[in-house]
Design a protein with these regions (language model features):
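Non-heme Fe(II)/2-oxoglutarate
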Residues: 1-67, 88
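Hydrophobic residues positioned within well-ordered beta-strands of beta-sheet architectures
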Residues: 76-78, 99-101, 172-176
Length: 180
């Protein structure tokens, strides 16, 4: 993980367009989301990461019983997130993608979990609240505290967010989207 973390920091330092975007959009920390589309070719470690992600996404799409009509899902986007203290990623989804995910590079203590929202929530259905000890998969929100090196995958329509980073240290992750 140390090598990929060093690559993230090095790319962040060199990415003037990304730094400018973060400043203009009051993003606390750094993201390459709006500036770099070539991370796989920029650093050999990202090329190796792509091979690992391809395997995980292939297995995950099989478990989802997708009918891909013989086609493979392709890595469409990959970007670095360095979330500083006080920063967050507001609730969002990933349009025009099939599978999205994140690999966790640095997760200091007190850093925020990722929060997934039950997709029925915005439908405003008349449903009673859940019991405090309800099964996790029945709750309106699920929080996951990933470990360093973990890769989380989800279908891109699933709304999610990263609440405020309460750690004084940066939370580093690499996010990605797969599509046709």
């Amino acid at each position: 993980m140390l090598e990929i973390e060093k690559s993230c920091w090095s790319i962040a330092q060199d990415d003037e367009a990304g730094q400018k975007w973060c400043e203009e959009n009051n993003y606390p920390g750094y993201t390459s989301y709006a500036s770099l589309s070539d991370l796989i070719w920029r650093s050999p470690i990202f090329k190796d990461l792509k091979k690992i992600l391809d395997l995980h996404v292939d297995q995950f799409s099989s478990e989802l019983d997708f009918d891909l009509e013989g086609r493979d899902l392709k890595l469409e986007d990959v970007w670095i997130n360095i979330l500083a203290e006080g920063g967050n990623h507001s609730a969002h989804l990933h349009p025009n993608s099939i599978i999205s995910g994140t690999m966790y590079i640095s997760m200091p203590s007190e850093t925020s979990a990722i929060k997934f929202e039950d997709p029925r929530h915005p439908m405003m259905m008349a449903a009673p609240s859940r019991l405090v000890d309800a099964k996790e998969y029945l709750k309106p929100f699920i929080y996951i505290n990933p470990l360093v090196g973990e890769i989380l995958l989800w279908e891109s329509w699933l709304r999610h967010e990263v609440p405020t980073n309460m750690s004084s240290e940066e939370r580093i992750s690499i996010s990605f989207n797969y599509s046709w």
